[in-house]
Swiss-Prot record:
Name of the protein in question: HTH-type transcriptional regulator AlkS
Segments traversing the membrane: none
Gene (name only): alkS
Induction: Induced upon entry into stationary phase.
Species of provenance: Alcanivorax borkumensis (strain ATCC 700651 / DSM 11573 / NCIMB 13689 / SK2)
Residue span(s) of domain HTH luxR-type: 805-870
Length: 872
């Protein structure tokens, strides 16, 4: 090609490529974590992933971060070539050279060799940073060698950003020094990135990630589909995308292979060849990985692979439509393959889909008990057991015991008791062997706790540990976990600490996954009961990390911890949760949660709905829980729902009717559970007297009673609400100064523990029905409620970062911590006194106490030491 013609060709090609670059990036978000600046020392950034992971977008964005007029960037997109695969090394070099230098070099170029040499000279002598961004290379033989040579020969200020045309292209690059590869795992969207898309928020983003697995193409489709609540594999857009962009690009035999592979629980050469009676998997699997990267190795074995769950569901549907008559046969072979290898959960999953339960008679005792009691696959086994004939279950003791366990944790206690009783019948197979390890008695003991019969469960669990604990470590972990949960529910926090330690040892030594989740639930629930939301969040994060290391199944883990996370986030700020996430957790708790779990989700969901103005829906949720409590014979749950209904009615109704509350004579639960309910009853009674606008003395009496009960069980949230009621009552009695100090005490506790919703809720409730409430709150100093109310994001970050106090013997009070916060912000003694409504002498007295406790001599060192101890 003549130089003039070559120059014109480069101009046309470059314009087309840069037009494509602008189009590709339209409506897309820049992901800073994937930008070259995140890998400043790297020479090459390589994006290697399946179709639809945003590789082209990343390369296009990198090209756009440096102005073309600077002459420091070249953007090559092979899809703009006139006939892909016909571009020689010299033409590729000409395109890069033209985009970097413009017309300047063309006057001295005489041949193709001159073009390549001129490009080499330009890059090697460049003083400023140069970017070469290439999208789609690898489709032809030409160009790859040139690019690899340029990478090796040019200085570090010349950087390359490359998206190969297929997953296996440019394999040698991956082995070079200074090459950073971003794979599918790196390129999936995070929740934070989804939030940047139009119309997204944090709660909705979580649903998007769960539905799509973060696959960027599917995220984009979900934003536009009219059926986002349906499974992603069923969206018309998804089906069209997979058909047109993936299946049509595959050879016929490969297309058939991946459809068949989707029917497997895990994809491996041996499994595929066994199920389908072939010998082709050893060729197809490497070919698919090399060219399309559709399979990902599992964590447990590099030989076993999985595909993206949405793609798998789509391909399974395709298999059903083409070979429906073979579906059951194939799944039975899959089940037998895993059964033979001892992979029983996979086997049960496959058999369940095949509706094959004939082998239930052959299942060994150890297998079913392991899957049920240790792995805790409650939902999977519940579906499976429902399809197994009851007569078969009753004839085999291990099935009866396991099914009873499943039913107890599915809140079907009456049926569980009947099934468990059937395991003692003389015709039941294998009972003697199971009783040697105490399985039946363990299920009975723990089952009592699921029905809120804690006193009986505590006794039975201790008897079980004394009798069977040394010969059944899995069972011991379950029994200790049950005792820990009982201690948490009864607010016996000192006993809980010891039981958490003993339970963790037993669970880890026996790899007890199900008990691990419940043990963490007990620990988290205790912090929520205390109202220490900041510490609860840190425990939640640590629990997820530990579960990841242990390999705990995420199915139950995510739902259980998610129900607790909902309560934590709602207490920090209702804006952090969504209707969808709250409803999902409520439905899970309704089916699988014991009293405290279900009540926590019910209270959170109903309060969220009430605050959103959906008051009828909020009260309907409480009624739904109350009905469930009556059906399941859970009087404590029924009582808690009644109290919350009374509170809502009190705030909502115009009529000044007394609230309908349980009588204290009905409190027949554990001692501290009774205290918690007494506190709530007294609180609602105080609110009612305040609503009347008179009887302030009676209102104060009830508030003090609530405060006393809440303090006895370390219930900070009820304590804060009671302090607000007490403050309004004494304000109505004429004691303005005492009222203000009481509110400041409540606000200091709120800030320290991050339980903001409780404070905001009670304040709004009091202002909604008491005319004098606004007079009280308006007379407080502007800073009295602390700066936390002004900046949610700051207080959120601080709360997340606050660790548990390492010095448990510290005598520093909440008020003194608030004073330290004032000191850390540079306030004078006078300013602190004005904020906290105390005298300057009192400030000095507190500082003296703080210095003595922290063993320091000045304010600067006091702040530093307080931070080291986790006080700030």
């Amino acid at each position: 090609m003549l130089c003039d013609n070559l120059e014109n060709w480069c101009l046309r090609m470059s314009d087309r490529m840069w037009a494509r670059q602008r189009f590709i990036t339209q409506g897309c978000i820049e992901r800073g974590r994937l930008k070259a600046s995140a890998e400043s020392e790297s020479k090459v950034i390589l994006y290697r992933a399946p179709l639809g992971y945003g590789k082209s977008v990343q390369v296009a964005f990198e090209a756009g971060t440096q102005g073309r007029e600077e002459g420091g960037v070249a953007y090559i997109n092979t899809r703009s070539y006139p006939g892909s695969g016909e571009i020689t090394d010299s033409l590729l070099a000409a395109l890069i050279l033209y985009q970097i230098k413009g017309r300047e070099p063309w006057s001295v170029i005489q041949s193709n060799d001159d073009i390549i040499e001129s490009l080499r000279d330009t890059l090697c002598n460049a003083k400023n940073p140069i970017k070469i961004c290439i999208d789609g290379i690898g489709e032809a033989e030409h160009g790859v060698g040139l690019v690899e040579n340029l990478i090796c020969e040019t200085p570090n200020n010349v950087k390359f950003y490359i998206a190969p045309s297929n997953a296996g292209a440019l394999a040698r690059l991956s082995m070079m020094a200074g090459v950073v590869t971003y794979g599918a795992h790196d390129l999936v969207f995070t929740e934070e990135e989804v939030c940047e898309l139009p119309g997204m928020h944090s709660a909705k983003a979580k649903n998007v990630i769960e539905a799509t697995g973060g696959w960027p193409a599917l995220v984009g489709l979900m934003c536009h589909t009219s059926n986002p609540n349906l499974p992603a594999a069923t969206w018309p857009e998804t089906r069209s995308y997979f058909r047109n962009n993936l299946l049509n690009a595959l050879p016929n035999n490969t297309r058939e292979f991946i459809c068949k592979a989707a029917m497997l629980e895990e994809i491996s050469v041996a499994c595929y060849d066994y199920v389908y009676k072939t010998e082709e998997a050893h060729k197809e699997i490497p070919f698919i990985n090399e060219n399309y990267a559709l399979f990902t190795p599992t964590e447990s074995s590099r030989e076993c692979m999985v595909m993206h769950p949405v793609l798998r569901e789509y391909l399974r549907g395709l298999f059903d439509s083409i070979q429906r008559e073979r579906r059951s046969y194939v799944l039975k072979r899959v089940a037998f393959w895993h059964w033979r290898r001892g992979e029983y959960l996979h086997s049960i999953n496959a058999a369940q889909e095949a509706s094959d339960h004939s082998w239930a008679r052959a299942v060994s005792d150890s297998i079913i008990l392991d899957v049920a009691l240790r792995q805790g696959e409650i939902e999977v086994l519940r579906t499976w057991f429902e399809k197994v004939p009851v007569r078969t279950i009753k004839k085999i003791a291990s099935l009866s015991i396991s099914y009873a366990w499943i039913l107890y944790f599915s809140q079907q206690a009456r049926q569980a008791e009947k099934i468990l009783a059937s395991s003692t019948e003389s015709c039941s197979r294998g009972l003697d062997n199971l009783d040697e390890k105490g399985w039946r008695k363990l299920v009975d003991a723990v089952g009592k706790a699921t029905q809120d019969q804690f006193a009986q469960s505590q006794t039975l669990c201790q008897q079980w540990i004394d009798t069977f604990g040394e010969r059944n470590m899995v069972g011991k972990g379950a029994a200790l976990t049950c005792q820990a949960y009982i201690a948490s529910s009864d607010r016996r926090f000192e006993d809980l600490e010891q039981l958490l330690h003993r339970g963790a040892v037993a669970n880890q030594s026996s790899n007890q996954h199900y008990a691990f989740v419940w043990l963490k639930t007990a620990e988290l629930q205790a912090e929520i009961f205390k109202g220490d939301i900041a510490h609860a969040m840190s425990i939640l994060l640590e629990a997820n990390k530990t579960a990841e290391k242990m390999g705990v199944s995420k199915t139950f883990l995510n739902k259980m911890l998610g129900s607790l996370e909902l309560q934590i986030l709602h207490e920090k700020s209702p804006s952090l949760i969504s209707y969808e996430s709250a409803e999902e957790s409520f439905n899970f708790a309704l089916n699988y949660g014991v009293t405290d779990i279900l009540w926590g989700c019910t209270q959170t969901f109903s309060s969220f709905l009430y605050q959103q103005g959906l008051r009828d829906r909020a009260m309907a949720i409480l009624e739904q829980t109350r009905i469930a409590a009556c059906e399941r014979d859970l009087p404590r749950l029924n009582m808690l729902a009644k109290i919350q209904l009374a509170e809502f009615t009190l705030i909502n109704d115009e009529e000044l009717e007394p609230p309908i509350l349980p009588d204290e004579s009905e409190l027949t639960f554990l001692p501290n559970q009774n205290q918690a309910i007494r506190a709530r009853i007294a609180l609602v009674n105080s609110m009612y007297r305040l609503r009347l606008g008179k009887q302030f003395g009676v209102a104060e009496k009830y508030a003090k009673k609530a405060l006393q009960s809440a303090s006895a069980i370390s219930d900070a949230r009820t304590k804060i609400a009671a302090q607000y009621c007490q403050a309004l009552a004494v304000f109505g009695l004429g004691s303005s100064k005492l009222a203000k100090r009481t509110i400041i005490d409540a606000d200091q506790l709120t800030e320290h523990l991050s339980c903001y919703f409780t404070r905001d809720w009670i304040k709004e409730a009091l202002m909604s029905f008491s005319p004098i409430a606004r007079d009280l709150f308006d007379t407080l100093p502007e800073s009295a409620e602390t700066n936390a109310t002004k900046d949610l994001e700051v207080r959120k970050e601080e709360a997340d970062a606050r660790p548990k106090l390492t010095n448990t013997q510290s005598t520093i009070t909440i008020k003194q911590i608030s004073l330290l916060k004032c000191v850390s912000s540079g306030m004078t003694n006078k300013e602190i006194a004005e904020r906290l409504l105390i005298t300057e002498d009192t400030v000095k007295w507190h500082l003296k106490k703080i210095f003595s406790e922290l063993k320091v001599t000045n304010r600067v060192r006091a702040v530093s030491e307080a931070r080291l101890r986790g006080l700030l």
